[in-house]
Structure formats: structure tokens, C-alpha cells
Amino acid sequence: MPENLTKFALVNIQVQMTLQEAIQARHSVRAYTDKPLSEDVVATLKAKINEVNAAAGLHVQLILDEPKSFQCAMAKYGHFSGVNSYLVMAGKKTDDLDEKVGYYGEQIVLLAQTLGLNTCWVGVSYSKIPDTYVLEDDEKIACYISLGYGANQGVSHKIKSVKEVSNASDVTPKWFLDGVNAALLAPTAVNQQKFFFEYITGNKVIAKRGVSLVGYTQMDLGIVKYHFEVGAGKENFEWAE
């Protein structure tokens, strides 16, 4: 299996695309069909969720066959329909929770895309239904991610230029440009793209979040950092503060 193929293909799962192809294909989808997730797809997602929770100390939970969270007024205002499965993105109440949720949550999102599923990050357009998830006293929910087979594949949106979000130039490495281009295709809150990547000497990269009245910039930063890693190749650089 090529290195850039997701490693979470199980016996009965045929991986449909590489992570790079998933980045190109992924668009936020808010309307879903009633097609259920197969046992193999669920098992693959749960394997990734277990890995993410162990690696980051998160408490991500996959909720299946539960439509009530997306039947509230806010969900209708957000144009969600047919949502029966979703991810509860939860973790300990720490300063870096949002960034960890973004970074590791996007790993699940791109895996889902390779499995033929569609997703959408959801900040407020849902309701928390009692007894559908479990939280410890020191944990909180950062957001939800809707999940399922889309009624459509979503649409692309206008994105910023490379120059607006990085210091890429004729003298920066190609991998840096590849990383920035991958980051530009990442989902961010209301498509705000409030981030900046700076290449510094020694193949080090600084990722910064901007200021936004909308919020969610720390979560967005985690999402775009993962996209950057996929595009650039983690072996080519190190993150710097």
C-alpha cells in the first residue's frame, strides 16, 4: 500500500483515495441520505477514534442512528438535514483543547472522505441530547462533526491566495508551497481562513492564527496544520514556535 494511503483500511474496506486526493475532494456537506454506515466503515472509524483519543487525550465519540441533535432550530437555520450520525469532539478543559480537536478531528474527517463519506464541522448548529454521549467532570464538548453519505458532494468556495496566508516565494522549498496549498483547502469557520504559515531557516515552519470576531481560530489552526503536514510531508520540516 502506498505511504500516502490511509493505513486504516480493514479487510472488507476498499480505500477509495489518498489523503491528498481526499483534501481535494472534501467539501462541507450539510444534507445527508438515509444510507446507513456499514459495520466495516464503523469499525474503521472507531479504530481511528481510539488512536486519536489515546494520542491526544481526547474523548471523541461516534454517535450512530441519532437524529435529534440536528433537528433543533439552530440546525435548521444552518441548513442541516438527514444527519443521523456524528462525532462528539470532546476533551479535557485545557488551553490547547480546540487546537487538538482541530488537528485530530481533521484526521478523522479525511479518513471518512477516503471511505466515501461526507462531513461538516459544526460549531453551534446542533443540540446536546442527554445520554447520547459521556463526559467526565473535567471535560467539555468543543464541537460536533456531522457524518454520513451526502445528498451531494458539497461545493468549493473562494479561497485566499498563497501570498495572503504565507511567506512563500521563489526561494522557499516546493514542499512549503505544497503544504500551504493543502492548508488553503482545509475547512475553517465560515471559510474565514485566519491563519498564516511562515517558513524560516533550517526547514522550520511557524503556524499562526489570526484575529476573528467569529472565533474558532484555534480550532481552525489545528485543522490547517494537519492539512499542511499532509501536503508538505512531515518528514520535510519541523514546527517552530
Model feature map: region roles:
Residues 2-241:
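Acidic, surface-exposed loops and disordered segments
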